[in-house]
A protein has these predicted regions:
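Glycine- and other small-residue-rich loops at beta-strand/loop junctions that grip anionic moieties
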Residues: 8, 31, 67-68, 94, ...
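Conserved C-terminal alpha-helix-loop-beta "cap" of PLP-dependent enzymes
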Residues: 66-121
């Protein structure tokens, strides 16, 4: 057996415990980097121009990964325009990167197909700055006004 005969399989228990300790020690910046405030501000901007903030469907959403839909512009077009502006976003989940189809997760959530086709995924990291979020907001809002 594995893990000195205590369990079957290939789980790396020492590795998992080490990762848990590292996350506890290093997770503090995530809690205090202002990401919640940044995303709340951006969500208000998205709603103000008629966009859809999919996290509104949840009681306890995350501030680090969000799906937003822009009125009048496909996700594919948004991804290309953000890329030209030097900003990385995606259409769909990380595990389906490269796919240009609406997310099955959004479909399962009951999101209408036309809204899903206009939805992009936006992620914040532990080191995302207020300036980067503001730049993203400016580009997104400019796109929404032109759509």
């Amino acid at each position: 057996g594995y893990e000195r005969g205590y369990r079957r399989g290939t789980e790396n228990l020492p590795g998992a415990l080490g990762m848990a300790a590292a996350l506890e020690a290093g997770g503090e910046p995530y809690m205090h980097n202002g990401a919640w405030k940044l995303m709340a501000e951006f969500a208000a901007e998205v709603r103000a121009v008629g966009g859809t903030w999919h996290s509104d469907r949840f009681d306890r959403p995350t501030c680090y990964i969000n799906a937003i839909a822009m009125p009048g512009l496909s996700a594919k077009a948004q991804v290309m325009r953000f890329d030209m502006a030097g900003i990385s976003v995606s259409q769909g989940s990380a595990c389906s990167s490269g796919t240009m189809k609406p997310s099955r997760v959004l479909e399962a959530m009951g999101v209408e197909r036309d809204v899903a086709e206009r939805t992009i995924r936006v992620s914040l990291g532990w080191n995302t700055t207020r300036e980067e979020v503001q730049r993203f907001c400016e580009v997104w809002l400019d796109m929404a006004k032109r759509a």
